[in-house]
């Protein structure tokens, strides 16, 4: 058998993280997660194949395309997870979707066998089964494809390398907030190393730019634990007033600002689909907008500031950030032309862009 489970946020909403983990370990069934289910287990869990979807990891997406039986639990398989090519999603699999909301099951874009049950009820009645050892080993091979590596950069720091190192240095039980802006979103979901008891928070329903700072404030107040926020320089300015909230309450939030000279994700879209005609995105080729230096913003609010400018200084600077008791802003200088590590591929044919399935994601050069 080649079964695969898609673990969604509904599992946590049902407070069934522990029983879900016991189930997959007893059955020895590999799983991938949605964005909202990414922190159900540590990244290192041997059955965790990664995060699926358009901003997800290539190994997880390949596992979905290769499996024979797919069980989606606590998710409704939204387009960010399946893309618009719903007829080519998990083409070799029989798909079952476990969801407590009948209306969502009735409006699925993917053809599934619906099971309108809560996660707890499903776990009570689920049959135990085992995956073939060869399939488990195949998923472990696919998981290796998720690794970031150490790509070369002309200057500054590759955001994926930075985030990989940073999240590995964080203690277990950290609350990690990812902003909804493109660069932070792709970087966060494709390179975060989640440890036991850590949380990964993001506005997954909206993927809203600028959501990171207010989410970090709320998460820190609610959890009372070390909180980090990964955010781009463009998104950083959208809710900058929250810096005063952070300063006023001396919240232990470590803000890592990816400075890629403006709106990199939009710039990348303009490059790929609009012939490189850049406007409203900042950077060397577009002077229509500008950004206040992050150092000046941190000084205005009286928050500690550090900067990472090279690959060699990543660990040292992150260490100094984590050693501080209160809030800190860490500016991470990244190339303005850095490509997304993995993204949905498109082929241009006769002036049209033809989308590709997620097992053929485009890899950064």
Kindly label every feature range from the protein language model.
Residues 2-14, 24:
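Glycine-rich phosphate/diphosphate-binding loops and the adjacent beta-loop-alpha structural elements
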Residues 37-138, 255, 318:
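Glycine-rich, acidic loop regions that bind phosphate or pyrophosphate groups
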Residues 14-36, 174:
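Redox- and metal-dependent alpha/beta enzyme cores, enriched for Fe-S-associated oxidoreductases
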Residues 19-27, 82-102, 197, 342-358:
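A short, gly/pro- and small-residue-rich
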Residues 66, 106, 114, 120, ...:
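Thiamine diphosphate
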Residues 140-223:
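Active-site diphosphate/adenylate-binding microenvironment
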Residues 10, 36-40, 75-78, 101-102, ...:
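Acidic, glycine-rich active-site loops and adjacent beta-strand->loop/helix elements
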């Amino acid at each position: 058998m080649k079964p695969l489970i898609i673990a969604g946020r509904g599992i946590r909403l049902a407070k069934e993280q522990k029983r879900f983990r016991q189930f997959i370990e007893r059955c020895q069934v590999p799983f991938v997660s949605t964005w909202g289910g990414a922190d159900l287990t540590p990244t290192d869990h041997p059955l965790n194949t990664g995060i699926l979807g358009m901003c997800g990891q290539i190994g997880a997406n390949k596992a979905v395309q290769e499996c024979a039986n797919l069980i989606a639990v606590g998710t409704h398989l939204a387009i960010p997870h399946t893309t618009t090519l719903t007829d080519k999603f998990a083409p070799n699999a029989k798909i079952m979707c476990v969801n407590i909301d009948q209306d969502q099951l009735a409006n699925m874009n993917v053809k599934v066998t619906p099971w309108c049950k809560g996660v707890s009820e499903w776990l009570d009645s689920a049959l135990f089964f085992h995956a073939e050892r060869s399939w488990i080993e195949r998923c472990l091979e696919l998981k290796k494809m998720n690794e970031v590596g150490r790509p070369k950069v002309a200057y500054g720091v590759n955001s994926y390398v930075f985030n990989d190192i940073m999240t590995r240095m964080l203690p277990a039980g950290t609350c990690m907030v990812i902003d909804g802006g493109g660069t932070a979103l792709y970087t966060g979901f494709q390179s975060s190393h989640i440890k036991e008891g850590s949380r990964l928070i993001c506005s997954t329903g909206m993927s809203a730019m600028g959501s990171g700072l207010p989410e970090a404030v709320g998460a820190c107040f609610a959890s009372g634990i070390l909180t980090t926020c990964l955010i781009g320089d463009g998104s950083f300015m959208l809710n900058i007033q929250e810096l005063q909230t952070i300063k006023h309450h001396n919240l232990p939030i470590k803000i890592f600002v990816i400075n890629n000279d403006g709106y990199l994700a939009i710039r990348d879209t303009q490059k790929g689909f609009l012939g490189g005609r850049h406007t409203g995105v900042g950077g060397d080729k577009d002077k229509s907008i500008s950004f206040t230096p992050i150092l000046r913003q941190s000084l205005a609010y009286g928050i500690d500031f550090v900067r990472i400018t090279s690959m060699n200084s990543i660990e040292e600077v992150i260490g100094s950030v984590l050693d501080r008791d209160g809030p800190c802003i860490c500016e991470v200088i990244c190339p303005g032309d850095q490509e997304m590590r993995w993204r949905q591929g498109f082929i241009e044919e006769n002036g049209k862009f033809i989308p590709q399935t997620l097992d053929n994601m485009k890899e950064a050069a």
